[in-house]
Amino acid sequence: MLKSILIFLVLNAPAQANLGSYKDGRLINPNTNQPYTGNIDIINEDWGKDAVEFNKDYVDGVLHGTEKSYYQSGKLKSLGSFKRGILDGIVTGYYEDGTIQVRATYDNGVKQGRVIRYYPNGTKQVESFYTDDKFDGVRTTWYENGKPI
């Protein structure tokens, strides 16, 4: 069964208003019929009434700023940055206990530089290098005890 996800607009006021739809690739605020600027919590009702699955920043209806995803427990699952709707900057994925699972860098939507995956115990698992979204160079792997493979 598909998750029923409702999008809510986070306002400074205590109430939350239901967000509208996308028009020409921009998120439209149904209260003003204009592209939305601000922070949004996306609620997963299957998890509970106020269970946030995503938190996103928008400017002029386009993702711009931080995007966070959460586990059902409420703990941070991933953190990334967007510029004008395109992934840009460091993206970090986390295990539910908060340990880093993966870290990568994007430049204008393209994977660039070092990508590191970690075991749940925090030890490096794989380190790879990318140029223009393609593997480039040496890939190093480790056993969970930290010894190189």
For the regions a language model picked out, list residue spans one by one:
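Sec-dependent N-terminal signal peptides
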Residues: 3-13
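Glycine/tyrosine- and acidic-biased, solvent-exposed loop/turn segments at the edges of beta-strands
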Residues: 11-149
